[in-house]
Amino acid sequence: MSRRTRSRSPPRRSYNRERRDYRKYDDSEDQKGARYNRYVDDVSSRRDRHDSFRSHESNKIRRDNSWKHDKYSYEKRYQERDREYARSKNIPDQYIGRSPRPTSHRHAEEKEVDNKTKSDETNPVLQGSATEIKPQPRRSRFDRTERVGASLSVSEIQSENPRVDVIPKDKAVENNHQRNAEKPVASDKITDAKLLARLERVRAWKESKAKQEASKKEEHKLNTKPQVTAKDQNAMPSTGISGFEINRQKDTSDMKRNNRVHMDDEDGPRRMNLEDYQELWDQEDRGMLGNEQAASMEEDEVDPLDAYMASLVGTTDTIRPGLLNTEVIDPNANDDERMVISETLEEEENLLALAAKRSKKKDVITVDHSKINYEDFKKDFYVEPEELKNLSPAEVDELRASLDGIKIRGIDCPKPVTSWSQCGLSAQTISVINSLGYEKPTSIQAQAIPAITSGRDVIGVAKTGSGKTIAFLLPMFRHIKDQRPLKTGEGPIAIIMTPTRELAVQIFRECKPFLKLLNIRACCAYGGAPIKDQIADLKRGAEIVVCTPGRMIDVLSANAGRVTNLHRCTYLVLDEADRMFDLGFEPQVMRIINNIRPDRQTVLFSATFPRAMEALARKVLKKPVEITVGGRSVVASEVEQIVEVRPEESKFSRLLELLGELYNNQLDVRTLVFVDRQESADALLSDLMKRGYTSNSIHGGKDQHDRDSTISDYKAGVFDVLIATSVVARGLDVKSLQLVVNYDCPNHMEDYVHRVGRTGRAGHTGVAVTFITPEQEKYAVDIAKALKMSKQPVPKELQTLASQFLEKVKAGKEKAAGGGFGGKGLSRLDETRNAERKMQRKAYGEDEEDVETEAEAKSPLEKITPEKSTGDPTLDRVRAAVGGIAARAFANQTAQSNKLTQPISIIKTDGDEYKAKMEINDYPQQARWAVTNNTNIVHVTELTGTSITTKGNFYLPGKNPEPGEEKLYLWIEGPSELVVNRAITELRRLLLEGINHSLEGGNKPSASGRYTVV
């Protein structure tokens, strides 16, 4: 029972009315007697009990205050009782009055007075003596000194302090022998040879360490550098762990051990020497000598610590786990040896870092097609109908002209069909087509389906909403059904890659009506959705995979490539291929394509296909047939295009006017508003909601789940107005969408065509309104061109803006706007990288040094001799281009290596301090970040023991600092030239990593809205 619980017992219990001592009694009978006496004497009235209770409460409060300082205080009357009890039990006088627990320092004087009074009254030897006796201090169970017993003399007891004898070792051993002689079983001599050998090793080891201690201390004094204080208030100290000086005069027991760097007095790291524990062991030995039992243990039993440490002599030193990352260097090694070891360790760390980086990088396992025996497959299924065989070339040209002017590039292209029955489709496919309401093939379908079914690689270019998806889906179903079913562990037969997630979902939904009847399984793999569900679908088996390039790379590289593979893939579709390459997916697309068998069938479709994309497309195609319907980048004739030139302030009011006119006349219609930026989409959404229009926004900054649900609600009619960026400019198909508003003018013609093409699909009509401000005159040229190509009237205001801009371009006052997606892909990547490298070389001042290397990189490509030629001109051009890229990469790498290897001067100050200045202003942003972020700075300072400070200001290339200012640089300070050089080497390594990362990933698309693969 606790103290507080006992003190608050009810007052009706008679034995708790009076104040009593709450210490623990040793005799239970004494407790019972005291309780009985108090119970018999308690015959007071109720009032007395009440007064007693009040007294009890006041005493309790006073007692609680006393317990705050001394938990076990005594009163005079209870001490007298203890003395009587001690006499009855024959307890020695010296223990009378001693508390079984230590008292507080605050009441030490009171305890001494109580003990003196008790001793004077009870000890007959000390009665009448004027000498005060102080109580014996409480000894810990860990004390090895001899306790003073009752047999001590009076003079010893009367001494000022209690005596603690320290018996010499030889005397202790002698006394131990005498005591052991009285024991019949004890032995006077150790006969265990193993124990004697251990004792001998311990003595020899202690003697050798004692001899080395003096020489080591003197050597340490010589090597210790004088302490230098920082003169600048903002400057960091130059020595110590992490750049801070450690006051080694203080006790270092409270210092936290660093798990990475061993806190040592020397500049460089050293081994953990056993002599560091010598002082601790000597103190332990001195404590053992003061105890007789310790003296006997010296001969009978070896201390476990000494025996264990002695067994380690001659073995390899073990480094603590916390020091695994620390360099282990001999403390007696000179500076040259330390530098060699340091460079070796740095090289190993670089290799480990590179290996870790490569292990984290997701990459598809490269497939050697020459070592794989692929199954044969058939891709020519087309049988020309009898009614088409008899058509003459003139009649075929007339038929193609009637189908929106189909243009063909390539040889042996099949004739276009006029009905579904001529396509050679199965009965199940025809039934699904009829249920969907497709009466006859569209222009692109009439020509593309026979071409793809005959096994040709096809490039299909057609206007938006012309049915391009069905044009490659129907031949794909026929292609899949001709092959054997999938086995466990086999990958898909057909892959459809798209640039956006919304387009992938759209194509997957168009596949669904055919899958059940044809007994085909499909999987949609795109970013933002849980990858575990997609992996589960692939493991169950899927003949069709609709995917985005990034997620397909994740799936192929997951679990070391054991999730799925591309060995069975024979049909590849690249939908909106120009946009895929423009978004920077060219490396991912090529990695996927290179892992598909070379004799595959490849199909490319898009509404816009610039000429500059042809060379890129032909890398993945073999003798393709190009089918163009209605021209390149042409808006469908079903769309009414309206272009208005108006200031920025009037656009919102005009938008409200258009929405009011539309919804006053029609109810179940949809409106799509395009803006340029995500912030503009959210701001416009807020404004429309305030005006009472049910609307929502979609852009790349939203989660994929939100984007999918937004499109589903938009198609279902939950809201009528959708505000979006160009993320839905391709693939979005909503039948009731009748109004498209380009709130922000598109910056090139291809984007304009795709935005406007969201309406007027599948034969329906629609309206597209575009707002353009007078400041956006450079975009007026492309919009006017699109109107002319689609045979729409061009407004006078728009034509005036276009003419004014063209005049400025001719006069050299303006630069022509970009031509959309043309010239992008690999060409854009190479040009951008070359421009960045030129800027970096110019900033580094390396133009003159790298003239020869740059000339070699720009030299004409090596001619492919007939012996080296592969027979394929496309492959030969690719090999030559790869050689040129390798030469440019080598030139850039050489230039940066020359810059980083330039020496940096180290200055020695008067206070034996070494300083160095390392400029970082002209390096790329990622390289500057690598050497200025706190994590790397702390790592370098802990590794080298230097102080690194970032000083100066950053200036853009071509700008000079103001008078009295300096460009951005690192100020390195250290106690020796060795540590400063090591810091410079480590910083150069970080700079090189940052430069390489900047060159490799500088042109990758932003990761906003991307998924995270766990």
UniProtKB/Swiss-Prot annotation:
Compartments reported by the entry: Nucleus
Chain location of the short sequence motif DEAD box per the record: 575-578
Occurrences of domain Helicase C-terminal (ranges): 638-802
Molecular function terms, GO-annotated: ATP binding; ATP hydrolysis activity; nucleic acid binding; RNA helicase activity; U1 snRNP binding; U2 snRNP binding
Residues reported in the UniProt entry to bind ATP: 462-469
Main subcellular location of this protein, as a coarse class: nucleus
GO annotation, cellular component aspect: cytosol; nucleus; U2-type prespliceosome
InterPro entries to which the protein is assigned, alphabetical: DEAD/DEAH_box_helicase_dom (IPR011545), Helicase_ATP-bd (IPR014001), Helicase_C-like (IPR001650), P-loop_NTPase (IPR027417), PRP5/DDX46/KHDC4_KH (IPR056149), RNA-helicase_DEAD-box_CS (IPR000629), RNA_helicase_DEAD_Q_motif (IPR014014)
Catalytic reaction list: ATP + H2O = ADP + phosphate + H(+)
UniProt keyword terms in alphabetical order: ATP-binding, Helicase, Hydrolase, mRNA processing, mRNA splicing, Nucleotide-binding, Nucleus
BP terms from Gene Ontology: mRNA splicing, via spliceosome; U2-type prespliceosome assembly
Biased composition (Basic residues): 1-11
Residue ranges of domain Helicase ATP-binding in the record: 449-627
The UniProt record lists the keyword Metal-binding: no
Biased composition (Basic and acidic residues): 15-87, 106-121, 827-838, 855-875
EC number(s) stated in the UniProt entry for this protein: 3.6.4.13
Motif mapping: Q motif: 418-446
Region (Disordered): 1-149, 815-875
Function comment: ATP-dependent RNA helicase involved in pre-spliceosome/complex A assembly and mRNA splicing. Bridges U1 and U2 snRNPs during pre-spliceosome assembly and enables stable U2 snRNP association with intron RNA. Through its helicase activity probably catalyzes an ATP-dependent conformational change of U2 snRNP.
Family of the protein in this entry: Belongs to the DEAD box helicase family. DDX46/PRP5 subfamily.
Entry remark concerning the domains of this protein: The Q motif is unique to and characteristic of the DEAD box family of RNA helicases and controls ATP binding and hydrolysis.
Name this polypeptide is given: Pre-mRNA-processing ATP-dependent RNA helicase prp11
Annotated organism of origin: Schizosaccharomyces pombe (strain 972 / ATCC 24843) (Fission yeast)
Encoding gene per record: prp11
